[in-house]
Amino acid sequence: LLTDAAPMQQSLPRRWITLYLSTRRGIAETRWSAYVESSLIIGSDAAQCDLCLADGRTRPQHAVLEVESNGVTLRPLDEAAVMVNGDPIGGEYRLQNGDTIKIGRTTLRLVL
């Protein structure tokens, strides 16, 4: 029986996320990696996003990657167009290692 123990603090889910970015015109992929805690906002406005895409078809805040204890989900923001593995998604989507995400003209390949 513990009586004087401090309350247990719940830590936020976090994990390494690696994305390989390529554009329609680009030949090579660009590697982007970060230790993501809780969420990652993707968009075209560097002041509002964690990952900024220089893409005229990307909204200032386009989508959010959410890290949860049981995986990673992707959610479009404000009905923005997002595709995963060639199919449009209309809401929250559970991502798998190797999934391909299309935002505007930019393709992102996910490595977990």
Regions found by a protein language model. Name each.
Residues 58-60:
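Amphipathic hydrophobic-ligand
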Residues 89-99:
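Eukaryotic mixed-charge, acidic/polar low-complexity intrinsically disordered regions
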Residues 1-56, 66-68, 95, 102, ...:
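Intrinsically disordered, low-complexity acidic Ser/Thr-rich regulatory segments
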